[in-house]
């Protein structure tokens, strides 16, 4: 069944090519198509395009379809083009001509837009929850190991004293900034495109404010042409947020792989969290971090993939935009999987509390000695030269006590302030409006 079907049949090869993976991708959107339809028909009844009894029956049947989606039993039949057609067909089978009325004042263009926005904001909430969970694990580890020193590096050369408190805490604070990107993406997403129809509005007296409130959007995409222009732009902006989070996790995974190697031995994974080799019986490989790194590096390409699909399109709808679904919709599950696994493995990771007992790391205390001499009155440059010559002569015996007390340093991690930043950003999403609207629609 095709919503646009007339008195001729399309070539089967053309149909195969143009439908592509739409049925597969549209399963991500199914329950959101139902929610959008529930809001739309409620509005249609309010402007006299549906009778009250018709609305009651349609809403009841849409709730049944929603339950099918929740149970994973909703399917798009082989001869049906997309999720919108499948939902309308199920309603028509059950309720006859009543089911054919739900498309009044609507195009598949604004229908898929609202589906994508409802899906995306839900997924952004789930990602925010997972980011917060990983953040909490990192802060806990930072506090647990705040006094355990490790070498800091520049140019992959040992540089200055650092600590596991700083290392874990640095990635926690990075996630705070990443959440700002996520929040901006959420705010741009959480606007109602419904009522823009094919991109030029409708002659029906649609009440767009009503559907905005019913669906729990913050506001609407006011200009109907811009609503359609937003297709692809939303995905690109969300893609940047996903890529930013993925960048933090990929870097952390790289560090962990490096620190887990025998040449570093800074951290250790429990053996049940490693994999082995088919030929080398001693191997305990950090595959989990390697796969997190690879998956997150792939996710960092998402905004570029979206841009390359849409960057030469003029105003209006084009079928090119369908291809964005194939890279965009699965990305949320991939990122959530990486976040969940990262939180799990960070919880299990063990740290070496005696790294700096090895004299090979003594030079990292050189700056501490320079500063001590400078504080005692020696000119800084003279102190710098003296310590450098002592190291070259093998005469440097460092005092390994650390005296860092300023904000954000080894002795003053500022984890409490970082936690406040994260909580403020998380609270500013205001997910409760979205959740309340969905609950009200479903009764």
Model-identified regions with their sequence ranges:
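Alpha-helix capping and helix-loop boundary segments enriched in small/acidic/polar residues
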Residues: 103, 108-111, 155-162, 166, ...
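A helix-coil-helix interface module used to build multimeric assemblies
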Residues: 1-201, 206-212, 219, 275-276, ...
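Glycine-rich cofactor/substrate-binding loops
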Residues: 1-36, 97-98, 265, 280-443
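Acidic, glycine-rich loop-and-beta core segments that form the ion-binding/anion-interacting portion
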Residues: 215-303
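A general structural motif at alpha-helix termini
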Residues: 58-59, 215, 271-273, 360, ...
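Short amphipathic alpha-helical segments with heptad-repeat character
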Residues: 117, 121-128, 132, 139, ...
